[in-house]
């Protein structure tokens, strides 16, 4: 999946664009739309086009990282996690999306990543809130997933259970929704 314009706009709005190097709140040398790395040098200046190119390259790296989470994501949830990874890094993305955590738990946990240098940062708090809201707005309901289960899109038995858990769903809740649909159809 690729980041939509909604996700790109979110990242650009919170990162801002600076064409000269600066130190971010975590102390890293930064340029453009929050680009960091060994290629960023003190006193460096870039053009707007270079800032856009850095952003595009960085997005690809974070999109791959979000894809590796193996979560069953809608575009909105994907965009939220790319923004999160862009700002917090791949290591924190892995911690956030650890195996067994449901998508609702992930949405709640996003809010806790609002510190830099051990201090709560208002801008990070606002960003995490927007990312959490965007993420939640994309989570499929248990009923939607149950309909996919009934269409055999998730496999059978233990395979289905493991796939649902790996994708960030509560197996018990989805199974209850499946049973409710089956009971309703039996009336």
PLM segments and residue spans:
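Extracytoplasmic Gram-positive cell-surface binding/anchoring modules and repeats
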Residues: 142, 151-161, 171
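General marker for long, soluble alpha-helical cores
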Residues: 145-148, 153, 178-185
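Long, amphipathic alpha-helical surface segments
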Residues: 1-20, 26, 35, 40, ...
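Short hydrophobic-aromatic micro-motifs
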Residues: 30-32
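Short alpha-helical scaffolding segments that buttress acidic/His motifs in well-ordered protein cores
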Residues: 11, 78-85, 109-110, 149
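Repeat-associated, polar segments at repeat-unit boundaries in modular proteins
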Residues: 128, 132-139, 167-187
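Active-site nucleophile-His-acid catalytic modules used for acyl/amide transfer and hydrolysis
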Residues: 60-91
């Amino acid at each position: 999946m690729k980041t939509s314009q909604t996700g790109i706009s979110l990242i650009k709005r919170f990162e801002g664009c600076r064409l000269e190097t600066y130190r971010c709140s975590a102390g890293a040398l930064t340029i453009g739309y929050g680009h960091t790395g060994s290629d960023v040098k003190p006193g460096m200046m870039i053009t707007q086009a270079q800032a856009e190119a850095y952003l595009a390259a960085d997005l690809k790296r974070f999109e791959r990282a979000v894809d590796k989470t193996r979560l069953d994501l809608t575009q909105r949830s994907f965009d939220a996690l790319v923004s999160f990874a862009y700002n917090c890094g791949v290591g924190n993305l892995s911690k956030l999306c650890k195996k067994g955590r449901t998508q609702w738990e992930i949405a709640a946990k996003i809010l806790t990543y609002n510190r830099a240098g051990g201090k709560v940062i208002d801008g990070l708090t606002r960003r995490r809130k927007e990312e959490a809201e965007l993420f939640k707005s994309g989570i499929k309901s248990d009923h939607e997933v149950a309909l996919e289960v009934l269409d055999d899109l998730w496999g059978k038995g233990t395979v289905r259970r493991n796939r649902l858990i790996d994708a960030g769903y509560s197996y018990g809740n989805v199974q209850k929704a499946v049973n409710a649909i089956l009971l309703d159809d039996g009336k």
